[in-house]
Amino acid sequence: MSMSRAELQNAASRAFGDANLAPDAEQSWQLIADMGWLMMTVPEPLGGLGLGAEAAGVIHSELGRALVPGPVIAQMLVIEALAAADQLAERDDLIARAMGGEVMTASLGGSGAFACIPDADRATHLLTIDANRIALVPLEGAKMTPRETWDKTRRLFDVVLARDAVRFAIAEGDAAAALASRLDTQRHFALAGDSLGGAAAILALTIDYLKTRRQFDRPLALFQALKHRVADLKTQHAAAEALFWSRATGNAHAIDMAALKALATTTYRTVTEEAVQLHGGIGLTMEHHCHLFLKRALLNCALGGDADHWEETAGRHALATA
């Protein structure tokens, strides 16, 4: 199947463009499954659309633009891992269920106790990821504790697996290390897309506000100091977005994708922090939509390693390979 980036963007915009920001979690998740977005990157022989990383980038960007809740990133990690599990007898059935919308979530690493698991209370399975073993574990009998977070568009849980939990082995040893690296790369790319979509949305809302809000009988958008601030934000976002789409070929080195995640999430944070200021007094009220974007930006910065960590790692890698 072939579908252009513009066609995908139009489809996603029609689905969520007219909705309120941060739509209902259950309804939006069902819509995501019905639209087939969970099967975007799954190879066609496994029942997917086989559209590749660019299609996934469009979806993550548009979902971030509308602040759509739900464990889309985690679900896609699960599906990607299952697609690589050639020896798992239950693979095809599990992939079909995941693509159909049965919630399966993923950890960021470790074993036994897991922190910050998206939508664990709705999930039937948890993908456990580390460098030595990757497995899918049913969540029956697991202990789940909601984690308080500033981002109200997403729900995170700390999970302790049951002692007798059955594990569906996906990869071990060198194969697990290679797959874990690929999943890390996919997660970085997804978070970058979510961040740049959100940054574009709040920047557009801020520009609209500056055009309509008047002071001294003039729209705020005519004040040169404010125009320069917005132009700087637009330039920063455009540069990050250009890098994002250049990485959508799927051939980027893992460290390059981590650096992209650091740049995109930092851009998102900068844009949202400036948006709060540019909205003036109303932007400081907790009920204003600026804070929905700001808090999502802050969580995106933290997930999977913050910008300082990845920038230092990328710098060391560049020096070592120079």
What are these regions (language model features)?
Residues 192-224, 228-241:
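Oxyanion-binding "anion nests"
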Residues 5-13, 58, 77, 121-122, ...:
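Glycine-rich phosphate/cofactor-binding loops in nucleotide/flavin-utilizing enzymes
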Residues 2, 17-26, 207, 215-218, ...:
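C-terminal helix-coil-helix/basic helical segment that borders enzyme active sites and/or dimer interfaces
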Residues 33, 269-294:
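A glycine-biased, small/acidic residue-tolerant capping/turn segment at secondary-structure junctions
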Residues 30-35, 51-54, 165-178, 217:
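Acidic-glycine-rich active-site phosphate/pyrophosphate-binding loop
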Residues 71, 80, 88-200, 204:
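FAD-binding core of flavoproteins
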Residues 1-72, 315-322:
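Amphipathic, small/basic residue-rich leader segments at the start of a protein or domain
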